Swiss-Prot record:
Catalytic activity: Endopeptidase with strict specificity for lysyl bonds
Residue numbers binding Ca(2+) 3: 987, 989, 1021, 1023, 1145-1146
Pro-peptide region(s): 25-228
UniProt name for this protein: Lys-gingipain
Active-site residue list: 444, 477
EC nos: 3.4.22.47
InterPro entries cross-referenced by the UniProt entry: Caspase-like_dom_sf, Cleaved_adhesin, Gingipain, Gingipain_N_sf, Gingipain_propep_sf, Ig-like_fold, Pept_C25_gingipain_C, Peptidase_C25_Ig-like_domain
Site positions per UniProt: Cleavage: 228-229, 737-738, 1155-1156, 1290-1291
Family: Belongs to the peptidase C25 family.
Species: Porphyromonas gingivalis (strain ATCC 33277 / DSM 20709 / CIP 103683 / JCM 12257 / NCTC 11834 / 2561)
Name of the gene encoding the protein in the UniProt record: kgp
Length: 1723
């Protein structure tokens, strides 16, 4: 109905509380309710109360007292004295009658007169929100107030209420208080012990009914039952799929399809029916009968629907008139058992047309799939307690404050909570447009509006919250009355297109003040007092934030209705009743949606790479409690729920029988959905990683995983033909012993004549050159029968014999032999019967078919595959690691490979862009790769960090040079307002570090301790620290005062502390703690002022007395600003008792990067001298400059603060024309400057300016940002200088304050005194700089990537060079790394010409006396390319010379591949891009002028050159194809006269244009090569491209450069040895590179380790232990572990652990610059 806005004084209503109260202490230490010994037969319960509170109230009937007990509710007959009672909802087994036996209690009488209390007030009926308070009578039963003696209910009462989703519900009421109204006395029965037995209970039927009806989606409701623990041991808990019955109007069939498809993908088994089906029908009776039958049939089959979706308005599904409300209700479609408790979650997607239904569905799909472009709106909420002069201060405000205090706050992830507990409400609904995830209004309403503040249906239609859809709850009258003649408020809210809500919870009839209050916060004792979590039952707010529950829109409504049921009374009409509220409240929209609570979490999951066919189930890893579904094309195949270990067994109701892509959807309350596709097919034989996890910290992503199982993935033998005559074998790889190798010979009828191969191995390796000839066949004709057995210990096949016609050969297939690892001679033979020869296979493959002294390494498999090679044959050898670790890991982000070759089971990537990313890890084996295992990661924030600008890249030879401009073109673009560096980060994974301090201030022997999972799990980790207020193992109650103190910190500018905290038990959560900072010491007395102090509250499930530690509380992140100078931080656990543990984890402290603001007072400067630490410039050169003045020296001077100022004069005994600069020190990062100035009031016009410089301190570096000419009295009179006295007059003006904003990039500030003369002075004092971001260039650094791999970080310069880059195209990228994140990468492509710069070979380092001698072999004998030029730049390449010998101004140039010169069309057939060209005619206007070119194009120096190849071309038309050129060489210089012709030609036309490749030998001594264009005129031009010059090795065409520990120590060497004098005693890394004329080779490096060191008599500054094969080095420095080949195996600081194989190792430790080396033998 339409509501009136009532503004009525409280005195006009029945009662009005005011703050006069008293508390009566009872005979119990605490108020507590417990349920124990719970079973299907009985349970025990105890109730104790520690106080009764009396509050004086004024009513229309007089003054009374209200009595309350925490956790109890007001009861009584209307008009009779009101007393509190405790009410619990209990589960009753099938067939049982609950019987209560009181075992014991205490009883005490209290005289209220002693407390000055009035009579207890009469109990009043509930008030509808539609009632006019003026007309509500105050009910007073005079007879009840004349009755003598104690009056009250029986101590215990039980009432059966009905059956709710398979559980019979009863109300257990405890009435602890009786009242003698005449004597004004209370009788309180306390410490009540009872036993509730279930007589006639049928346990089997109870369990059967529960099993048949159970769904995890009803846990929210089950958790409100007092004795719920009897149902927790449910074996099939995670095998129950979600089922939904859908009944829809026939007109919605098409519009409903996308929603049905999604629900099936999500894992809902759908049973969909329409009203045009005969069994459904169109009447209310037929639809209800159909639904009831469906539910009962489903219950009988243990497949009862969880949800009932009604689709359409009342024209297709009418609903019916409520028995209690007399308004339309859908309750009885789902209340199947004949009572008022529903069996299904019911919601109505009310739409009058398919278009309106589509509007609802579109919003639901975006919300559930989380595809909204900006999810940040989910972190915002709107809470409104509407206007009502009486009830708003008694109920409305308390409701909203409860929500904010416990849930809608920063601790729960909300960034903005728009709370309006009372007027004014200005602009409150504007937040719906900007975006909120939740909106709640409680007060008055009408069928089409929230009343005050008013939001009408028309205004809802004008909302603009596109893509920001929310859940709305209206605790008010009639806003969900869906049979109203026009769409009701809730219908409009859900039906509007691209705006409004995806679901609305509201009441169809009038709602009631008290019941709506209970509905929201839970049933509680008294109005007008702020409710507490502990003093209320579970309400809808509490249920919304239950952890690990399937919280849906429907379950929120159920929780509210159960709270109203909880508060209901027995045997009286005090309240409107629970039945009314179950009829009243409805969900419009999709009630099966699980609302997000602020920003949803990211699910941790692992998907199989494929789904094998015909399996009954699949295992999928996901966060515990996740619901996992597999479907295809909208058809659901199977579902499962992830158990506590995070494994979901997806049971398939429809098996996969076809290949294709199948949808996998993972959902969980308050988690982002996972929506993926998996290919169905045969499983991969290659095992993937397991237990992949992904965590984020800022923009850093960390992946961790477990290695594949020890049994290697190549588990079955497989033979694959991969080409004609090419055969590959894959087989198990871990089937040899540690000292063995496997040799495999494979072939596929290579010659097509069934002649195959044999493999002969000589373990003595002494047959090569004799039995095995270096060339030619093994033998011809007949060989000795014992040739093989006498010389070859191992054969493939095992029965191979020396007969050319033998069948004991490998023709097609493979053979193998296992041999001891070691050195062998071998050969692979091939018989040729026609010639009688036993050939040794040719060398056409990648491995010789005969070998002298080949090493077969233990633990490896060698596969020799025979193949045709032209007219001959050959072998390709593939080597596999035969150990279980013969694989590496490859990491992908968003489908792109970002790292490969990993051997560790962890990976970190910093600077990841904000947003959602998919990371995948695959295992790369020798013979194949595993399926990818993937994880979704959400990186918070936005890419707001400025990138570099104007990045360029160039290459000369193999050297790449990058150049760029700083971000935003400024030296300090850091967008982070509070940058800093991490000073401390501790996760307590290895306990409490020794550098931390603990203080047990209460001395009970129980301080902070380390804890580990599973008992005490850390935040996203195993470890944390904890402190106890209750000890297990008989310790009992503790009163802790425990300090946990960080190591010493250096925070001159303060910092920011973040940490995670939680209660170890959510049911004993009230742990009190504080955070302190000390700038002095780390004793308890040094910590005085708390920066943060709070008591943890449970915010999770509540339960009766339980085993402590059973339900860990919710981890909450806290942030604390630390003051400047903080040296220590302390976490103090105190003022707590009888709870359990407080847990602490992930402590991180970041130092503020911001420089402290500072003020220059000039007090440290000297009178008459330039100010200290400032720079002055006397730009006018008159010898008068800025200087310090002291009021102690000049009596006319008054400083602004202190005694000193600075001054500049325009008159100082004489007229001056000043141009004086006063320049600050470096103030990079300053954003403002505030200062004070004064002038002579008599001569006030001294002009000055404030100037800034972004570069240096020269006068020309500064620009004006502010200037002024001061005003004054202009009264003339005395002027004053350094040598004058005031004589009593002080004409100095007052001090004037100015503040000037400084532009970004300001480095220096100057005060310039100029543009004035013959006045007097300007004074400055107290100059204050306000600093912004971090002031130094280390605000950010640059990171350089090549081809996706990070190659350099920490750069501060805007240039980078890399030498020795491999040939080919490369992508270079530069990103800016800020303290708070990284910028997007800016990239450029750079091409390195394919010139081969061969490195040295076989570098070795050996000691010789006190020296280190390096030896190496020269690069490969083929010198390789000395020059390779493709002219792809836009100018003549660097190093080349273009010589215009004829002097006409026309020379060689670079042109594109196709161009037009008038009518002379030129087409370059040489390449697809640029060429070098010289012209023989010149276009001027419309005519060509002839040229007579004599142009030289000269290469860089190419000493040692032997051969040149190039491409030469002429235009594509015959009449202009006769240009002449010559190839010339010089053995001296680059003048034209230095060159001699070695080849020349006149071009001739060929079809399509000339495209000629020339290859010419170059004479010995060639230094330069030139292309000379001459002896032609008036043709067009000559084009040259792709010039390659190679050398053979003579001549000094390269030199060697030697590096020690990264530093160049010698260059220009031509010998292949180098002696490093005096360096043999310490370990070093030596590298040698080859420097060619056009570039350098890659470095080749070796680690030198001395044989030993002198005995050290002093104690070694490290410890070295070997346990088994694990080497552990601990030191206060660096440690490195090497093998005897000098390869570094492990390195690190402080502690290095390495698991070795058998053999010898060297350990080097460097402490304080001194090296120590030890050798180890590992058996």
């Amino acid at each position: 109905m339409r509501k009136l806005l009532l503004l009525i004084a409280a005195s006009l209503l029945g009662v009005g509380l005011y703050a006069q109260s008293a508390k009566i202490k009872l005979d119990a230490p605490t108020t507590r309710t417990t349920c124990t010994n719970n079973s299907f037969k009985q349970f025990d319960a105890s109730f104790s109360f520690n106080e009764v509170e009396l509050t004086k109230v004024e009513t229309k009937g007089g003054t009374f007292a209200s009595v309350s007990i925490p956790g109890a509710f007001p009861t009584g007959e209307v008009g009779s004295p009101e007393v509190p009672a405790v009410r619990k909802l209990i589960a009753v087994p099938v067939g049982a009658t609950p019987v209560v036996r009181v075992k014991s209690f205490t009883e005490q009488v209290y005289s209220l007169n002693q407390y000055g209390s009035e009579k207890l007030m009469p109990h009043q009926p509930s008030m509808s929100k539609s009632d006019d308070p003026e007309k509500v009578p105050f009910v007073y039963n005079a007879a009840a107030y004349a009755r003598k003696g104690f009056v009250g209910q029986e101590l215990t009462q039980v009432e059966m209420l009905g059956t709710m989703r398979g559980v019979r519900i009863a109300a257990l009421t405890i009435n602890p208080v009786q009242y003698d109204v005449v004597a004004n006395q209370l009788k309180v029965r306390n410490n009540i012990e009872i036993e509730v037995s279930f007589q006639g209970a049928d346990e089997v039927a109870t369990q059967r009914l529960y099993d048949a009806s159970f769904s995890p989606y009803f846990e929210t409701a089950y958790k409100q039952l007092f004795n719920r623990d009897v149902y927790t041991d449910h074996g099939d808990l995670y095998n129950t799929p979600v089922r939904m019955l859908v009944v829809a109007g026939a007109k919605f069939k098409e519009a409903l399809k996308p929603w049905l498809t999604w629900k099936a993908q999500k894992g809902f088994y759908l049973d969909v029916h329409y009203t045009d089906e005969a069994e459904v029908g169109t009447t209310n009776a037929s639809i209800k009968a159909f639904i009831h039958k469906k539910y009962n049939d489903g219950l009988a089959a243990s497949a009862a629907p969880v949800f009932l979706a009604l689709v359409g308005d009342t024209d297709v599904i009418s609903g019916e008139k409520g028995k209690k409300t007399k308004k339309v209700t859908d309750l009885y479609y789902s209340a199947v058992d004949g009572d008022y408790f529903p069996e299904m979650y019911t919601f109505r997607m009310s739409a009058s047309s398919p278009e309106e239904l589509t509007n609802i569905i579109d919003k639901v799909l975006m919300y559930e799939k989380a595809t909204m472009p900006d999810k940040s709106y989910l972190e915002k909420a709107l809470l409104i307690a509407g206007a009502d002069s009486y009830w708003n201060p008694k109920i409305g405000q308390q409701t909203i404050k409860y929500a904010v205090q416990y849930y809608y706050n920063q601790d729960h992830g909300y960034t903005d909570v728009y709370s309006y507990p009372k007027a004014p409400y200005t602009g409150c609904y504007s937040h719906l447009n900007t975006g909120v995830g939740f909106a709640n209004y409680t007060a008055h309403g009408s069928e089409t509006s929230w009343a005050d503040p008013s939001l009408t249906a028309t205004q809802v239609k004008a909302l603009t919250n596109k893509d920001k859809y929310f859940l709305a709850i209206g605790n008010c009258c009639v806003t969900a009355q869906f049979d109203y003649p026009q769409p009701c408020f809730g219908e409009v809210m859900t039906r509007v297109k691209e705006k409004g809500a995806y679901a609305y919870i509201g009441s169809s009839p009038n709602s009631y003040w008290g019941e709506d209050y209970y509905w929201s916060v839970g049933a509680n004792a008294v109005f007008g007092v702020q409710p507490t979590f502990e003093g209320t039952s579970m309400g809808s707010y509490d249920a919304t934030f239950l952890e690990d529950s399937y919280n849906t829109v429907n379950s929120i409504m159920w929780a509210g209705n159960l709270a109203a049921t909880h508060a209901g009374n027995i045997g009286n009409i005090t309240h409107i009743g629970a039945h009314y509220y179950w009829e009243a409240y409805h969900v419009l929209g999709d009630g099966s949606v699980m609302p997000y609570r602020a920003m949803p979490k990211t699910n941790t999951y692992t998907l199989p790479a494929s789904l094998p066919q015909n399996q009954a189930s699949y295992s999928i890893q996901a966060s515990a409690g996740s619901y996992v579904a597999i479907s295809k094309d909208g058809v659901l195949y199977g579902t499962g729920v992830a158990n506590a270990s995070g494994v979901a067994t997806v049971n398939m109701t429809k098996q996969i029988t076809e290949n294709g892509n199948y949808d996998v959807v993972i959902t969980r309350s308050n988690y982002l959905p996972v929506i993926k596709q998996i290919q169905a097919g045969e499983p991969s034989p290659y095992q993937p990683v397991s237990n992949l996890t992904a965590t984020t910290q800022g923009q850093k992503v960390t992946l961790k995983w477990d290695a594949p199982s020890a049994k290697k993935a190549e588990a079955s033998r497989e033979v694959k033909r991969i080409g004609d005559g090419l055969f590959v074998t894959i087989e198990p790889a871990n089937d040899v012993r540690a000292n063995e190798a496997k040799v495999v010979l494979a072939a596929d009828n290579v010659w097509g004549d069934n002649t195959g191969y044999q493999f002969l191995l000589d373990a003595d390796h002494n047959t090569f050159g004799s039995v095995i000839p270096a060339t030619g066949p093994l033998f011809t004709g007949t060989a000795s029968s014992n040739l093989y057995s006498a010389n070859f210990e191992y054969l493939i096949p095992a029965n191979a014999d020396p007969v050319v016609t033998t069948q004991n050969i490998i023709v097609t297939g493979q053979g193998e032999v296992v041999i001891p690892g070691g050195v062998y001679d071998y050969c692979i033979t091939n018989p040729e019967p026609a010639s009688g020869k036993m050939w040794i296979a040719g060398d056409g493959g990648n491995q010789p078919a005969r070998y002298d002294d080949f090493t077969f390494e233990a633990g490896k498999k060698y596969t020799f595959t025979m193949r045709r090679a032209g007219m001959g044959d050959g072998t390709d050898m593939e080597v596999e690691d035969d150990s279980p670790a013969s694989y590496t890991y490859t990491v992908y982000r968003d489908g792109t490979k970002i790292q490969e070759g990993l051997t560790a089971t962890t990976f970190e990537e910093d600077g990841v862009a904000a947003g959602n990313h998919e990371y995948c890890v695959e295992v790369k084996y020798t013979a194949g790769v595993s399926p990818k295992v993937c994880k979704d990661v959400t990186v918070e924030g936005s890419n707001e960090f400025a990138p570099v600008q104007n990045l360029t890249g160039s290459a000369v030879g193999q050297k790449v040079t990058l150049k760029w401009d700083a971000p935003n073109g400024t030296p300090n673009p850091n967008p982070n307002p509070n940058p800093g560096t991490t000073t401390l980060s501790e996760s307590f994974e290895n306990g409490i570090p020794a550098s931390w301090k603990t203080i047990d201030a209460d001395g009970d022997g129980h301080g902070w301790k380390p804890g580990n999972a599973p008992g005490i799990a850390g935040y996203n980790s195993n470890g944390c620290v904890y402190s106890e207020s209750f000890g297990l193992g008989g310790i009992g109650v503790l009163t802790p005062d425990n300090y946990l103190i960080t190591p010493a910190l250096d925070l001159p500018n303060g910092g920011k502390l973040t940490f995670w905290v939680c209660a170890q038990d959510a049911n004993y959560a009230s742990e009190h703690y504080a955070v302190y900072a000390s700038s002095t010491g780390n004793d308890a007395s040094n910590f005085t002022n708390a920066l943060l102090e709070e008591t943890i509250t449970a915010k999770g499930v509540r339960s009766p007395e339980a085993i402590r530690g059973r339900i860990q509380g919710t981890w909450r992140q806290k942030t604390v600003d630390l003051p400047a100078g903080t040296k220590y931080v302390a976490f103090r656990h105190f003022q707590s008792t009888d709870m359990f543990y407080i847990d602490l984890d992930e402590v991180e402290i970041k130092a503020n990067g911001k420089r402290a603001d500072f003020t220059e007072t000039f007090e440290s400067s000297t009178h008459g001298e330039a100010p200290a630490e400032w720079t002055t410039i006397d730009a006018d050169g008159d010898g008068q400059d800025w200087l310090c003045l002291s009021s102690g020296q000049l009596d006319w001077l008054t400083a602004h603060g202190g005694t000193n100022v600075v001054a500049s004069f325009s008159w100082n005994g004489m007229a001056l024309n000043p141009d004086n600069y006063l320049i600050s020190k470096d103030v990079t990062g300053a954003t403002k400057v505030k200062y004070y100035y004064a002038v002579n009031d008599g001569f006030p016009g001294d002009h000055y300016a404030v100037m800034i410089s972004k570069t240096g301190t020269n006068a020309g570096d500064f620009t004006v940002v502010f200037e002024e000419t001061p005003n004054g009295i202009n009264k003339g009179g005395a002027r004053f200088g350094l040598s004058t006295e005031a004589n009593g007059a002080k004409p100095q003006s007052v001090w004037i304050e100015r503040t000037v904003d400084l532009p970004a990039g300001t480095k220096y500030v100057a005060f310039r005194h100029y543009n004035c003369s013959d006045l007097n002075y300007i004074l400055l004092d107290d100059i204050q700089f306000t600093m912004g971001g971090s002031p130094t260039p280390t605000d950010y650094t640059y990171t350089v990537y090549r081809d996706g791999t990070k190659i350099k970080e920490g750069l501060t310069e805007t240039t980078f060079e890399e030498d020795g880059v491999a040939t080919g195209n490369h992508e270079y990228c530069v990103e800016v790394k800020y303290t708070a994140g990284v910028s997007p990468k800016v990239c450029v492509n750079v091409t390195i010409n394919p010139t081969q710069f061969n490195p040295v070979k076989n570098l070795k380092a050996q000691p010789d006396g006190g020296d280190v001698v390096l030896k190496w072999e020269a690069p490969s004998g083929k010198r390789g390319e000395l020059l390779n030029e493709d002219f792809e730049g836009d100018a003549i390449p660097t190093g080349w010379t273009a010589l215009d010998a004829d002097g006409d101004g026309n020379n060689w140039d670079i042109t594109l591949n196709e161009f037009t010169r008038g009518e002379r069309h030129v087409l370059s057939p040489l390449r697809a891009s640029n060429v070098a060209i010289s012209y023989s005619s010149l276009l001027q206007g419309q005519e060509y002028l002839p040229l007579t070119p004599n142009n030289f194009l000269i290469t860089p120096k190419v000493e040692g050159a032997k051969k040149i190849t190039y491409k030469v071309g002429s235009p594509g038309l015959p009449q202009w194809s006769h240009d002449h050129y010559a190839l010339c060489i010089s053995k001296s210089g680059t003048a034209a006269a230095d060159f001699e012709v070695i080849f020349e030609e006149t071009m001739t036309y060929t079809q399509g244009g000339a495209n000629l490749t020339r290859e010419k030998d170059l004479p010995a001594g060639t230094k330069y090569v030139a292309f000379r264009h001459y002896n032609c005129t008036d043709v067009l031009g000559i084009m040259i491209d792709d010039v390659v010059i190679t050398g053979e090795g003579e001549g000094p065409s390269y030199t060697y450069t030697v590096y020690r520990d990264g530093t160049k120590i010698q260059e220009g060497l031509t010998e292949t040895t180098y002696r490093d004098a005096g360096m043999s005693a310490q370990s070093h890394e030596y590298c040698v590179e080859v420097k060619y004329a056009a570039g350098v080779s890659p470095k080749v490096c070796v680690d030198y380790i001395p044989d030993g060191v002198a005995d050290v008599t002093a104690q070694k500054p490290y410890t070295l232990t070997v346990v088994g094969k694990t080497i552990t080095v601990t030191c206060q420095g660096e440690a490195m572990i090497y093998d005897m080949n000098g390869r570094r195996l492990a390195a690190g600081r402080n502690t290095v652990v390495y698991t070795a194989q058998g053999g010898y190792y060297a350990v080097m430790v460097v402490v304080d610059g001194k090296s120590y080396v030890e050798k180890l033998a590992i058996k």
